[in-house]
Amino acid sequence: MPTMSRPALDVKGGTSPVKENANPEMNSLAYSNLGVKDRKAVAILHYPGVASNGTKASGAPTSSSGSPSPISSSTATPPTKPPPFNLHPAPHLLASMQLQKLNSQYHGMAAATPGQPGEAEPLPNWGFGAQAGGAGSLSPSAGAQSPAIIDSDPVDEEVLMSLVVELGLDRANELPELWLGQNEFDFTADFPSGS
């Protein structure tokens, strides 16, 4: 099969002949079951992971019966699978992410309303790297408030209880400090009365 050329657009919008199928013998042997258009597509773009119709390919071209071509199957390498992405991270990671989000929202509210009594200046916006103590963490400026202010911040009860449930701490009876402010008689309304 002779080398085919077709007009192609160059960068300036003009046309120039482009040579395709530089090795027609190899293309016709390795992809003997493909039509001329398919050979061009394989010669131009060869992605072993996904076939042209969106289905997963095995890395070796398949014949019409679905079996790999004998010529190219010995030279094809199987595609490597990327490590699976964990959609369900560990509970402690979810809890720390939730606390970080709340912390940044709380600092954002404090910065938006600096005129409140007891707040001399807006709190610094600490990034995730600073909380993790990474090497590239930024230290607060000399005039910034001390990090001890976080200890006096009120915690939203809904958020705290959602974290308790998420971590499974609601099933632990030996943590009475989590139930501060709740009376033991509050729980009697939850139980059905004997009738």
Curated annotation (Swiss-Prot):
Name used for this protein in its record: Cbp/p300-interacting transactivator 1
Keywords: Activator, Apoptosis, Cytoplasm, Developmental protein, Differentiation, Nucleus, Phosphoprotein, Transcription, Transcription regulation
Motif residue range(s): Nuclear export signal: 160-169
GO biological process: apoptotic process; branching involved in ureteric bud morphogenesis; melanocyte differentiation; negative regulation of DNA-templated transcription; negative regulation of neuron apoptotic process; nucleocytoplasmic transport; positive regulation of DNA-templated transcription; response to transforming growth factor beta
The keyword Nucleus appears for this protein: yes
Pfam families listed in its UniProt record: CITED
Protein localization: Nucleus; Cytoplasm
InterPro entries hit by this protein: CITED
Region listing for Disordered, in residue ranges: 1-24, 51-149
Assembly mode: Interacts (via C-terminus) with CREBBP. Interacts with EGR2. Homodimer. Binds to RBM14. Interacts (via N-terminus) with HSPA8; the interaction suppresses the association of CITED1 with p300/CBP and SMAD-mediated transcription transactivation. Interacts (via C-terminus) with TOX3 (via HGM box); the interaction increases estrogen-response element (ERE)-dependent transcription and protection against cell death. Interacts with ESR1; the interaction occurs in a estrogen-dependent manner. Interacts (unphosphorylated form preferentially and via C-terminus) with EP300.
Post-translational modification summary for this protein: Phosphorylated. Phosphorylation changes in a cell cycle-dependent manner and reduces its transcriptional cofactor activity.
Organism name: Bos taurus (Bovine)
Keyword ATP-binding included in the entry's annotation: no
UniProt-recorded Gene Ontology molecular function terms: chromatin binding; protein homodimerization activity; transcription coactivator activity
GO CC annotations on file: cytoplasm; nucleus
Recorded family membership: Belongs to the CITED family.
Comp. bias intervals (Polar residues): 97-106
UniProt function note: Transcriptional coactivator of the p300/CBP-mediated transcription complex. Enhances SMAD-mediated transcription by strengthening the functional link between the DNA-binding SMAD transcription factors and the p300/CBP transcription coactivator complex. Stimulates estrogen-dependent transactivation activity mediated by estrogen receptors signaling; stabilizes the interaction of estrogen receptor ESR1 and histone acetyltransferase EP300. Positively regulates TGF-beta signaling through its association with the SMAD/p300/CBP-mediated transcriptional coactivator complex.
Major localization class: nucleus
Compositionally biased intervals (Low complexity): 54-78, 137-148
Taxonomy, superkingdom: Eukaryota
